[in-house]
Amino acid sequence: GFCFGGWGVFRLGGKKVSENNDTPLVDCISTAHPSMLELSEIENVKVPVQILAPENDMMFKQDLKDTCNRVIPSLGLPYDYQFFPRVEHGFAIRGNRNDKDEMEAMVRAKSCAVYWFKHWFHSK
């Protein structure tokens, strides 16, 4: 999920198939420059998590990045945190293709997400 979708995928990553079935609703989650995340959503995630984090992000500030990097590993979940220097919130979907740093970040983010999903979907 991108931006607000980050909040959504964290919520989905904490859901069960049903009240009688503890199987997670989704296999894994990946988010780029998430927004609207709260501690409870981070603490309740139950599936492997990937975060693609830009250096400058008014929605995913450093304190929230630090919280994710502290809390998610403590849950015992597979966790992949990718840092993208010199780019801002929205880089993965609204980056400037004419800016070398932004273009490299968009390509790298796409590659990271594709690899993440292939790994977790094929390991089931």
Where do the language-model regions lie?
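Cofactor-binding loop segments of dinucleotide-utilizing enzymes, especially the Rossmann-like FAD-
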Residues: 34, 54-56
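Short beta-strand/loop motif that positions the catalytic acidic residue
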Residues: 45, 50-53, 84
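A short helix->loop->beta-strand "cap" motif at the edges of active sites that frequently abuts
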Residues: 26, 47-48, 75-78
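Conserved alpha/beta-hydrolase "acid-adjacent" motif
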Residues: 58-67
